[in-house]
Amino acid sequence: MKKKIFTSAKLLLIGVILLCYLVFTACSALALEFEQRDLSITNLDGKTIPIRVELARSIREMSKGYMGRENIPEGTGMLFIFKRDEKLSFWMKDTPTPLSIAFINSSGEIRETRNMTPFSHQSVDSSEPVRYALEVPQGWFEKNNIGKGCIIKLP
């Protein structure tokens, strides 16, 4: 009888520890804070356009991105920074806000921009190897006359 109670207590303790771990992990993923920087982009008219970006450098930051965010203020974005040039692929799973993305080479030149659909599982791929990707509210690039060939001052 004592052995049965001891085994039940052990299982209960393991269950409580596992539950605490899962709650802590879920809360820490939601509380992810991104480093922010003020950057600028020279648009097609030669004007300097300021933008405040959140930096996504780690796998964890890149995986989280704008997932779950309902509102992304104008003049802000998220800059994904990769260690080397590669063909990039993004999707909008669990992302409720329409976004535009710019694929940027290692020199800071925008090579292409694309629009992305909320909650889409379809990937949006760069057509060539690039080092960076910049996500902004959909339409921001067009409003600011930013497109292929524009230069972003990188961190």
Residue ranges and their predicted role:
Residues 3-16:
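Bacterial N-terminal signal peptides that target proteins for export
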